[in-house]
């Protein structure tokens, strides 16, 4: 396998920058996920690696070798698309072997590679079938197998699960993760689905409007987002955002607005003071699971507020409750056994250690 290096890579169309200063090292044997909304530049970035798009500025290195001007066939990469692009008149075996036959590889080696890949993907029993006799998941496995037999330096996957139904996507996410472990492959995986990114990636690159917003492990992306965009894009349901002011009283800090007053813990307060945010406007980000329902037996804290239940989403293991607290509309994740009805008035508390504060102007997170 191989490492990749993007050195300030840019892509422009008619003077319009679609990928802006993409600077990143992809480690050998890493599964790196590029995630972001449609049009953020993630697929364009992948196509530049494949050689299907030219690089406007910067350098792309595979194992230390500059490949900007190398044609796709000389880059030793394999690509899997959301459309399987299988030849309908060929068997599964012939579809998987097609690229090797074009290279004039020996028949014995072709057979060995195809059967080895089929064993890994558990499709040996399908080798004599044609694509029309396969399910969507089986076709996707064949498309993966066609890439595996080439034994490339790098696998590129461009939204390969988009055409599958929800249940099959979950299964195939696991299959691709297992495949990565077995092959010890370097994989760059593109998706707009943040759940795929969180569950599959060794690291995640969050992109928006052609720019890298954050590169980190899934845990850090979720708990320590770099900015407001990352915080809002990653997580389902999304993070709650509250606009307010950092108020100082008797040496302590509170986040306040017309609807809510939250006491800021000592360590967070100290850092906010040091960075000059006392008395300033900020945005507080609260994950739905970091808002809890208070009961009559709970001790009252400063970060407690009253809310009215608007809608419940019962997902079985959990309950997503949409509430109004004054002028603030919030999403709350509670245990599935919680008994709450629309119209109820409930008391909620915020786990302040988990709140992320953002600069109101730059929208950058403040830690």
UniProtKB/Swiss-Prot annotation:
Domain of life from the UniProt record: Bacteria
Pfam short name (any one): OB_MalK
ABC transporter domain ranges (all copies): 4-234
Residues reported in the UniProt entry to bind ATP: 36-43
Alphabetical list of PROSITE patterns matching this protein: ABC_TRANSPORTER_1 (PS00211), ABC_TRANSPORTER_2 (PS50893)
One Gene Ontology term from the biological process aspect of the record: carbohydrate transport
Keywords: ATP-binding, Nucleotide-binding, Translocase, Transport
Coiled-coil residue windows: none
An example Gene Ontology CC term for this record: ATP-binding cassette (ABC) transporter complex, substrate-binding subunit-containing
Keyword Nucleus: no
Catalytic activity, EC: 7.-.-.-
Cited InterPro entries: AAA+_ATPase (IPR003593), ABC_transporter-like_ATP-bd (IPR003439), ABC_transporter-like_CS (IPR017871), ABC_transpr_MalK-like (IPR015855), ABC_transpr_MalK/UgpC-like (IPR047641), Mo/tungstate-bd_C_term_dom (IPR008995), NA-bd_OB-fold (IPR012340), OB_MalK-like (IPR040582)
Signal peptide: none
Gene Ontology molecular function: any one: ATP binding
Family: Belongs to the ABC transporter superfamily.
Name this polypeptide is given: Uncharacterized ABC transporter ATP-binding protein YurJ
Organism: Bacillus subtilis (strain 168)
Organism placement in taxonomy: Bacteria, Bacillati, Bacillota, Bacilli, Bacillales
């Amino acid at each position: 396998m191989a490492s990749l290096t993007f050195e300030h890579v840019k892509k422009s169309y008619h003077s319009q920058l679609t990928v802006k200063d993409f600077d990143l090292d992809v480690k050998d044997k890493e599964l790196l996920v590029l995630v972001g909304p449609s049009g953020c530049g993630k697929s364009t970035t992948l196509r530049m690696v494949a050689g299907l798009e030219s690089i406007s500025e910067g350098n792309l290195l595979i194992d230390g070798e500059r490949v900007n001007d190398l044609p796709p066939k000389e880059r030793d990469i394999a690509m899997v698309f959301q459309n399987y692009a299988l030849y309908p008149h060929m068997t599964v075996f012939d579809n998987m072997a097609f690229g090797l036959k074009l290279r004039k590889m020996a028949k014995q080696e072709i057979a060995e590679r195809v059967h080895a890949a089929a064993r890994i993907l558990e499709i040996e029993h399908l080798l004599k079938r044609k694509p029309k006799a396969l399910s969507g998941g089986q076709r996707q496995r064949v498309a993966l197998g066609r890439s595996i037999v080439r034994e490339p330096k790098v696998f590129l996957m461009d939204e390969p699960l988009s055409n599958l139904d929800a249940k099959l996507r979950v299964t195939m996410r696991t299959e691709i993760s297992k495949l990565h472990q077995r092959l010890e492959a370097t994989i760059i995986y593109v998706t707009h689905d943040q759940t795929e990114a969180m569950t599959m990636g060794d690291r995640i690159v969050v992109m928006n409007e052609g720019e890298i917003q954050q590169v980190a492990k899934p845990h850090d992306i979720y708990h320590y987002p770099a900015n407001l965009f990352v915080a809002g894009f990653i997580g389902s349901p999304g993070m709650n955002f509250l606009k307010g002011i950092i108020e100082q009283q008797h040496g302590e800090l509170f986040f306040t607005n017309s609807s809510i007053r939250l006491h800021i813990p000592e360590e967070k307060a100290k850092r906010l003071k040091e960075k000059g945010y006392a008395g300033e406007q900020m945005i507080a980000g609260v994950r739905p699971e970091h808002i809890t329902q208070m009961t009559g037996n709970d001790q009252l804290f400063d970060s407690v507020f009253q809310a009215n239940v608007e809608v419940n989403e019962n997902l079985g293991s959990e309950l997503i409750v949409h509430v109004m607290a004054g002028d603030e509309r919030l999403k709350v994740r509670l245990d599935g056994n919680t008994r709450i009805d629309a119209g109820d008035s409930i008391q909620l508390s915020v786990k302040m250690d988990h709140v992320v504060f953002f600069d109101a102007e730059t929208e950058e997170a403040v830690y």
